[in-house]
Design a protein with these regions (language model features):
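Short proline/glycine- and polar residue-rich coil/turn motifs
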Residues: 101-103
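Extracellular disulfide-bonded cysteine-rich modules/repeats
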Residues: 105-113
Length: 128
């Protein structure tokens, strides 16, 4: 199984944690969930933007050192990714996706949509 729920108690804010061990596509019911990406390079495909998606929020955490990919942003991903090792931020503007070039356990990304765009923030140890 590619998505396995971890535990039975939702975290603060009603979030539920899942281990993701294969690539998958998010859908509107995944809003508020946390996904731990592990055991392989995982591609997470974003849902199609629409006004009904306004308020969608998801957190992706690297559970290994793979090169995970966020896809399907239709040139509508904006935000910043902090690079702890490099001491700077990578600006993301009108991107369709993002690839974690040198993954580390604990790297994380949060994506929020207003229905028109995706807004990404995150922190990596080694940058993109």
């Amino acid at each position: 199984m590619a998505l396995v729920k971890v535990g039975s108690h939702p975290s603060h804010g009603g979030q539920v944690v899942f281990n993701a061990t294969a690539s998958f596509t998010l859908d509107p019911s995944d809003s508020g969930k946390v996904f731990i990406l592990k055991d392989a390079a995982i591609t997470v495909t974003l849902p199609t933007l629409s006004t009904s998606l306004a308020g969608f929020q998801v957190k992706l955490i690297s559970g290994d050192d793979s090169e995970h990919i966020i896809a399907g942003g239709a040139s509508k991903i904006y935000g910043q990714i902090g690079d702890q090792n490099g001491g700077d931020f990578e600006r993301i503007a009108a991107a369709s996706g993002y690839t974690l070039g040198t993954g580390e356990i604990g790297d994380w990304f949060e994506l929020i949509s207003d229905g028109t765009n995706w807004y990404i923030s995150g922190l990596t140890d080694n940058g993109a």
